[in-house]
Every structure is written in C-alpha cells, then in structure tokens.
C-alpha cells in the first residue's frame, strides 16, 4: 500500500494548476504550456464571426468594367474606295482606342492602323487595299475606358463609382488604364450593299468637269445639226449664182411708173417740147 500511495502523490504533484496562478495571468513573463491550444481556440471562435460578418454584408456594386459585356454597337460604312466611316456607341466610354488590321494574310497583317483616344464618328482614309482586287477581311477593335472621364451611365447600369486601385505616382505611360475591347469582323466586299457605300461618288472637281464637258457636247451637237445647212448651201455654185442674180436685179430694173399717170406725163412732155421749139424759133430771126 505504501508504494502505491507514494506513486499517486508523485503523479498529483506533477499536474499543473487548473485555475489561477502565474500561468493564467496576462502580461507576466513566460509562455503558458497551453498557449498554442488557447491560440487555436481563439482562432476557431474568431473565424466563424468573420464568416458571419462577410455573409451578412451586402455585396458591393461593381463598376462598369465588371458589368456584363454589352453587344458591340459598332457600324462601318464605306465612303469611297479607300476610306471607311466608323461609328460606335458613346456608352462604351469616353476615351477610346481603335485598332484596324487585316486578318486574311496567314498571320501577317497586310494593313494595320491604330488610333489613340478618339471619339465617334471616325473617318479612316488611305485604306490599304489588297493587290489584284482580292477579297480583304478586316477586324476592327474599339477599346474604351472610364478612368479619365465618365459619361452618364446607360439605363440599368450601376451608378456607383468603380473601386479602382490607387495608381502609384509615376509617368502617365506607366499608369495603366483598363480598356474593354469589342471587335467586329467584316469584309470590304460585304460593305458594297450597305446604304453608306458610294463607290461611284467622285470629288467635286471631277463632277464639275463632267458637267461642263456634257454641256459642251450638247451645244456642239445642236450647232452641228443647224449650222451646216446654210453654210453648205452658200458655198455651192448654184447657190452663188442665185445670190448674185438676186442682188443685181433690183439695181438694174428702172423705176416703175403707175398706169394712171402715163397720159399726163406724155402731155407734159409734149408741152415742154413745143415751148422749147417756140423759144428757139423766136430767137433765130433776130
């Protein structure tokens, strides 16, 4: 019995105190033996609280960049043989970048163009055309951002400002701006049937020259139909003789005397002749 009692007393002396003591007092030197257990117990109690608070908090409203992507509101019209007119919706953003490149060159862009910070409508001139009139497929991508300017959000879109991370100070070219690109694939041959396609439209100078030449041709044609008739008739021999006889006949013909005055004229002429004879006979005897 004594050895068993001694073993029980030795085991009881080695057990730590259950309550109080220096090990439970906060701020005292030394680490309690059950510090890891207390830390894990504290974490187990704090984790459900964090999860509960996160679940109860309302979800934050996302900005325009997190909203579901709207369909591409891009339209392309062909103005002339080598120019395109591009339009897109303003709600896509204020500052937009536009990329245009060909896609049917087996990985190489036969034509590529980039426009930085532009707005609709945009006229793209001097468009590169494939040699030989081959079919040319193009891809047009418009990327817009809301960082440097915002317009009124479209109907149904969230009104809260997007929570962008604070940009670090530095040059503007180092501060990235989110861009949301929307691409449109099309072919130049497909644009011929659109209302905006006017392949035969020419510059104003060519139009004026064409109108002037048309007017000259019409006037010359009318003159050619009218003028040759009298000109040709005037240079013919019969026409020349007829004109000469017609011009000389009025000058050679004597003055016409009326029929009623013939007898009076003859009597007057006879009286004049008798008077002349009497004067002559009277003067001769003297």
Curated annotation (Swiss-Prot):
The chain crosses the membrane at residues 215-235, 263-283. Residues 33-43 have a biased composition (Polar residues). The keyword Ribosomal protein does not apply. Keywords: Glycoprotein, Membrane, Signal, Transmembrane, Transmembrane helix. Residues 20-43, 52-71 are annotated as: Disordered. Ubiquitously expressed. Brain is the major site of expression. It is a multi-pass membrane protein. N-glycosylated. InterPro entries: TMEM158. It is found in: Membrane. Residues 1-20 form the signal peptide. The keyword Glycoprotein applies. Belongs to the TMEM158 family. Receptor for brain injury-derived neurotrophic peptide (BINP), a synthetic 13-mer peptide. This is Transmembrane protein 158. It comes from Mus musculus. The lineage of its organism: Eukaryota, Metazoa, Chordata, Craniata, Vertebrata. The gene is Tmem158.
């Amino acid at each position: 019995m004594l050895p068993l009692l001694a073993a029980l007393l030795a085991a009881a002396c080695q057990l730590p105190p259950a309550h109080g003591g220096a090990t439970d007092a906060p701020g005292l030197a030394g680490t309690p033996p059950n510090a890891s257990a207390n830390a894990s117990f504290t974490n187990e109690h704090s984790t459900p609280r964090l999860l509960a608070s996160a679940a109860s908090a309302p979800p934050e409203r996302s900005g325009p960049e997190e909203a579901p992507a709207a369909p591409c509101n891009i339209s392309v019209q062909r103005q002339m043989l080598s120019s395109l007119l591009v339009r897109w919706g303003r709600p896509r953003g204020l500052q937009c970048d536009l990329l245009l490149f060909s896609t049917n060159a087996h990985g190489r862009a036969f034509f590529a163009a980039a426009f930085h910070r532009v707005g609709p409508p945009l006229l793209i001139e001097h468009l590169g055309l494939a040699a030989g009139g081959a079919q040319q497929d193009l891809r047009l991508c418009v990327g817009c951002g809301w960082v440097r300017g915002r317009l009124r959000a479209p109907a149904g879109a969230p009104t809260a400002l997007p929570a962008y991370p604070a940009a670090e100070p530095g040059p503007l070219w180092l501060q990235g701006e989110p861009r949301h690109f929307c691409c449109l694939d099309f072919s130049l041959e497909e644009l011929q049937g659109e209302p905006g396609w006017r392949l035969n439209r020419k510059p104003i100078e060519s139009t004026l020259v064409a109108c002037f030449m048309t007017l000259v041709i019409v006037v010359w044609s009318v003159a050619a139909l009218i003028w040759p008739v009298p000109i040709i008739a005037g240079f013919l021999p019969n026409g020349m003789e007829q004109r000469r006889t017609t011009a000389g006949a009025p000058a050679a013909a004597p003055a016409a005397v009326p029929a009623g005055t013939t007898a009076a004229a003859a009597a007057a002429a006879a009286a004049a002749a008798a008077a002349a004879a009497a004067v002559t006979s009277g003067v001769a005897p003297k």
